[in-house]
Amino acid sequence: MTRSEFLKPLIGEPWAWQSRNCWDFACHVERELFGRELPRVAVPAELSKRWVLEAIDRHPERAAWRQVADGPGGLVTADDGALVLMAHLRFPAHIGVWLRSEARVIHCSEQHGVCCESVLALRQSGWKRLTFYDPL
């Protein structure tokens, strides 16, 4: 299966807190496209923004990834398959996967389900702070 054949049917899949949240989706993409197994995260029964913020901030998996500095003019220099933490203001509350050849971030949001967006589109939709992480 080609990369395009894998990605195309995912677009538009719905978000689901217990089974298809942003982390579960990032794990799926990392496993299928990049052969990386990321740990599963047990989520509480009820959606809690506070829980999301704390889980992203404190999860030990973050130690296995290196933050990538922005290139000149804010260009993305991260490797293909980098994790992308997204924040509206200061604290990350969402995660996606950088697809370098497509110059897009694929992610699964509560509002839109699975979508593949440019950095500019993400910033225009309110994700003002994007931080890229390459695996160690």
Describe the predicted segments one by one:
Residues R36-E46:
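Short acidic alpha-helical/loop segments enriched in Asp/Glu that coordinate divalent cations
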Residues P44-G113, L136:
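...with weaker cross-activation on analogous glycine-rich loops/strands in unrelated enzymes
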Residues P14-F34:
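Active-site nucleophilic cysteine motif
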